[in-house]
Design a protein with these regions (language model features):
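N-terminal compositionally biased, intrinsically disordered segments and leader/signal-like regions
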Residues: 67, 78, 92, 99-100, ...
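Ser/Thr- and Asn-enriched, surface-exposed coil loops between beta-strands
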Residues: 47-49, 83-101
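Short Gly/Ser/Thr-biased coil->beta-strand turn/linker motifs
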Residues: 3, 17, 76-79, 92-95
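Terminal beta-strand-rich extracellular "head" domains
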Residues: 60-89
């Protein structure tokens, strides 16, 4: 379970933790984690259109997750979650798809992938 200091929030579920942020894709090159927003995670490019977010802590479960993409130019680009393992590997995969195929996003100051994870920091499932 997470051991970091978290700030107060209100939720109907007990022991909810939120980890969110954004990163700048860099075409076919590695992501520069110094440009990330948010705390408690890093990201690595794993192949064409594949980004693996690694959390700083494990969590017993995930309640919800969202991801989106911001681009400097209009494109038929979408992001979706792939494998999620917050309990042992501490990883969340984000896949990028442009016109139904895996694709990289060009390096551009305005191009960012955003995500928000609502995590369960207890073994209680409800």
């Amino acid at each position: 379970m997470a051991e970091k200091i978290f700030f107060d929030m209100q939720a109907l579920n007990p022991h909810v933790k939120i980890v969110c942020g954004s990163f700048k894709p860099n075409g076919s090159s590695a992501v520069d984690n110094d440009d990330n927003t948010g705390a408690g995670w890093t990201v690595a490019r794993g192949g064409v259109g594949i980004f693996t977010v690694t959390l700083g802590d494990t969590y017993p479960g995930i309640l919800s997750a969202t991801c989106s993409v911001a681009l400097s130019a209009v494109a038929d680009t979408k992001v979706q979650f792939g494998a999620i393992d917050v309990a042992s590997a501490k990883t969340v995969v984000i896949n990028v798809i442009t016109t139904a195929s895996a694709a990289d996003i060009a390096a551009n100051a305005a191009n960012r992938i955003h995500f928000c994870l609502v995590l369960r920091n207890t073994d209680m499932t409800k």
